[in-house]
C-alpha cells in the first residue's frame, strides 16, 4: 500500500505519492480546490485510484512548536479525510517545508513567479521523504 503526503493550503494542495514499495516518491502534483469538503472528496478518489494505505498530512507549527490557527484547519481537514477515506491521517510537523521547497526550486533555476505552481507539490514531497525515512 502506498503512502500519500498532503500539504494542505487554502487554494492549492500539494500531494506526493510513494511508489508501491514505499521507498521513493512516485508522483507529485498540485490540486487546486477552495472548498475543504470537496478537496477531501477529490483526495479520497486519488487514494482509492492509487491504492494508498497511509495518509500523511502536514501540520503547520510555529517555530517554538506551538500550534496556531493553520494547525486547527489542518486538524479539521484531517477529520474530513478520515471520514472520506477511512484512513486516519498521520499529522506531520511541516515546519520549514515550504521554505525548503522554495530553496529547492530556486536552486534548480525556477523563477519566483513560477514557484506558486509547484511549491506545494515539492513541500508534500519533502514531507513524504521524511515520513518514508522513519519507516526504514
Which residues make up each language-model segment?
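Phosphate- and other anionic-substrate recognition elements at nucleic-acid/protein interfaces
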Residues: 2-3, 10-136
Amino acid at each position: 500500500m502506498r503512502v500519500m503526503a498532503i500539504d494542505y493550503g487554502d487554494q492549492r494542495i500539494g500531494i506526493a505519492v510513494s511508489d508501491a514499495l514505499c521507498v521513493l516518491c512516485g508522483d507529485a502534483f498540485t490540486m487546486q480546490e477552495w472548498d475543504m469538503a470537496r478537496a477531501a472528496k477529490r483526495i479520497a478518489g486519488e487514494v482509492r485510484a492509487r491504492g494508498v494505505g497511509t495518509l500523511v498530512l502536514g501540520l503547520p507549527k510555529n517555530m517554538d512548536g506551538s500550534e496556531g490557527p493553520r494547525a486547527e484547519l489542518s486538524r479539521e481537514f484531517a477529520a474530513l479525510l478520515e471520514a472520506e477515506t477511512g484512513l486516519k491521517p498521520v499529522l506531520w510537523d511541516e515546519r520549514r517545508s515550504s521554505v525548503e521547497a522554495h530553496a529547492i526550486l530556486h536552486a534548480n533555476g525556477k523563477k519566483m513567479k513560477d514557484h506558486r505552481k509547484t511549491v506545494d507539490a515539492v513541500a508534500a514531497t519533502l514531507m513524504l521523504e521524511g515520513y518514508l525515512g522513519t519507516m526504514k
